[in-house]
Amino acid sequence: MADLSLLQEDLPEDADGLDVDDYSSESDVIIIPSALDFVSQDEMLTPLGRLDKYAASENVFNRQMVARSLLDTLREVCDDERDCIAVLERISRLADDSEPTVRAELMEQVPHIALFCQENRPSIPYAFSKYLLPIVVRYLADQNNQVRKTSQAALLALLEQELIERFDVETKVCPVLIDLTAPDSNDDVKTEAVAIMCKMAPMVGKDITERLILPRFCEMCCDCRMFHVRKVCAANFGDICSVVGQQATEEMLLPRFFQLCSDNVWGVRKACAECFMAVSCATCQEIRRTKLSALFINLISDPSRWVRQAAFQSLGPFISTFANPSSSGQCFKDESKSSEDSSAEDKDRMRDNDVVEEEHRRPEDAPSDLSAPHSSARLESLEGCAAKTPGHSAGDVPAPVDSSLLCTLSSESPQEAASNDENGRKPDTNSKSASRPDAGTSSPEATPLDQDMFNSFHFWRTPLPKIDLDKELQQDPEERLSPERTGDVPAAPLPGPPNITMATRKELEEMIENLEPHMDDPDVKAQVDVLSAALRASSLDAHEETGGVEQRSELQDEVCVSELPDCNISHDTCVPLISAAEENAEATPDYVHGGADVSPGDGFSPDEDRRPKVQDVVPQALLDQYLSMTDPSRAQTVDTEIAKHCAYSLPGVALTLGRQNWHCLRETYETLASDMQWKVRRTLAFSIHELAVILGDQLTAADLVPIFNGFLKDLDEVRIGVLKHLHDFLKLLHIDKRREYLYQLQEFLVTDNSRNWRFRAELAEQLILLLELYSPRDVYDYLRPIALNLCADKVSSVRWISYKLVSEMVKKLHTATPPTFGVDLINELVENFGRCPKWSGRQAFVFVCQTVIEDDCLPMDQFAVHLMPHLLTLANDRVPNVRVLLAKTLRQTLLEKEYFLASASCHQEAVEQTIMALQMDRDSDVKYFASIHPSSTKLSEDAMSTASSTY
């Protein structure tokens, strides 16, 4: 406030002492007094007086300055409660200013004033609620757009900082917003109010959102007059769903979402496509699979290119929502125990889901002969639908069953089986889990039954809350399980939705007929392909209902049947069954992947490439659309960067499908890896280590390593992706495969642009991590030359990281047996750097010694023998920079060690003599650092001042 008088104050013309005619008659010198020679009237006013004076000024700029200085005025009078209240009352009057710029300036200061009031609440209780919040709420409906925007930003800032009480939100904020969204409200105000309601929902919580915001939000989604309102609702739909939860989403929001997805304005449909993943996360798996999938297919086939573009960008994230959220990693269980013990462990795991998280193991530890893993979703239904009764043999070979069949084919009745499947419990407490004995062995007491061929333990499907029994399940058990009928059971689940009505099939046929005349358009052709696939899937379901098992067997690509109970299934089959050899009782871990089943030990047959790209984790139509993103026609008709979006989401899709379905994605991944756009390849390079974790060591070695090798020879923009995660990828490989890359590490020193020093800095960072993966001999033979090369880099930032690399290398080689590699490395450091003809090399030697001391890479007695004599000889170096750094190292690092503080050895005496010599150095900086031990000055803070750098 003190500077307000200097801004726009009109001084009277006849002010005392300002007459320009005053002069000294003796010297004839005109004296022009300055305004600073006199006491300003403002300096005589109190803070409240100055506030009142300029708040009433006719000058708009003065009133703006009053609004801007309100916080300073409050700080001046904060000790007096009455003055604080007086300032707040002036704020209320200033809020009625007719000038929009003054009101906007005032609103910008409200969050700061509110925070001050919160901190000084004892002095001015309820100040914000009584004086400031009404202004914010009132400005939400201001006629001026700038004032409204400022008040909206202020309201969100206040909510984010939790400065508004919950009671005030319910009684003052929400009612105003609801009024602003009334049908007779201004169009612009209504649109902005809806946006505020959506943005504040995550801040106010589920209760207030459901009671006060959700009903009006649903109404706004159906606003038939203003598409801007519907567009705002669609853009924020995912946020509302995540706040209110699954039940409210499915009951109230999903019908509105379906309407918005079919809106006649493409901008609304595009907004729906962009938030599709968030909406999917708030629904159950059944709705996601049966309803949202079909809805998303419509968006992908939308007539508007912008809608299709947004839909394809969201396709990968939407597919990832089909992943099993309870166990997305790998876990193992010991198969050496009896089936009874395994059953007990399954019960414990069902009661405590934390066991899965506590038993994570790296994928590279998985042996090659692991049994086929199963998803946790199937574990939940295992207790009721896959248990065997006592006396049944666990050594029988199961035959594949269709995914439309109910999960249980045990000796219990179909009604009991369905009940147990829903409840997730075992029908018999004495029943055993499905555990296979050694190949070729069987229990002498147990008699193999045909039911074991159809054991659903080996097959995965999403558990549904209510399942209608198929006709074949309601048949007589003996007829259903007769050996003559086993060969008719299909080998793989069929794609497409499981239950499609006749009316739906009729609609699909009509849509295909309407689109056939426009088959020249690639987009229309793609839509017809999708609809045809859905129609075929519905036809398959119709055949299942009417034709029974015999007709469905003709629709399968391959059928894997075991007609005899004690026979083994051939490894050439394309259906991932669990054979007896892979289910032996050895003490090997059984991996369970979080997405779904994993084929045995990741061992895929040579015919795998010819396997149909069919799976049952996600709707097949969605996967087909995702795989089509690499089609060149998509880049022309949808988005030129569609391949980049496909590459970006591929790890999430792979995790969802699981490694047993990698054959569906392999060709797409190879296509992306050879894409002409380097941005696509760069995206894959940055995520290849994550994909390796998902696929496991065998698939990584077979499919990812060749692509990884190609990335190593690509552009620098692509190479940096694999370099940043080089350690993460190599640690997943077998030791022999990992050693092959030792010969290629040297290639990272060569870049397309020599000025790309960050590339070499990242290489040094990765080499530090790679030290743990290789033997001391490999480190000495291959990593040592690279590290010494980086220590002599032209850029100081690269050298700084390299000093750390060399010190860690010294530590590893010194602790190795025998320690000859460490001694040889130290001798090479002395020869190449300690006696280097260039002063920068000798300075680098001091830096390395300092890092070795700080990180305790060598015992002090070993350091004193191998490095310290050569370090002390640099006290006579002709370059002051080297001597300055030596003085810092001796004073601030070496003498800090207990070895030199407690012992009176000859080494300590040599150090003290060197320091005394440096204290008498002719350079003032050397004497300074050698004479004192400044506590506030550390080598890490000022060593760069003495380092030579190109940049």
Swiss-Prot record:
Pfam families: HEAT. It comes from Mus musculus (Mouse). The modification Phosphoserine is found at S936. Residues 411-421, 430-445 have a biased composition (Polar residues). InterPro entries: ARM-like, ARM-type_fold, HEAT, HEAT_type_2, PP2A_Regulatory_Subunit_A. HEAT repeats lie at residues 26-63, 65-81, 82-119, 127-164, 168-206, 208-246, 248-285, 287-324, 506-543, 699-735, 800-838, 862-899. Residues 332-365, 474-487 have a biased composition (Basic and acidic residues). Residues 325-377, 411-451, 474-499, 590-612 are annotated as: Disordered. SUPFAM superfamilies: ARM repeat (SSF48371). Serine/threonine-protein phosphatase 4 (PP4) occurs in different assemblies of the catalytic and one or more regulatory subunits. Component of the PP4 complex PPP4C-PPP4R1. Interacts with HDAC3. Keywords: Phosphoprotein, Repeat. PROSITE patterns: HEAT_REPEAT. This is Serine/threonine-protein phosphatase 4 regulatory subunit 1. Regulatory subunit of serine/threonine-protein phosphatase 4. May play a role in regulation of cell division in renal glomeruli. The PPP4C-PPP4R1 PP4 complex may play a role in dephosphorylation and regulation of HDAC3. Plays a role in the inhibition of TNF-induced NF-kappa-B activation by regulating the dephosphorylation of TRAF2.
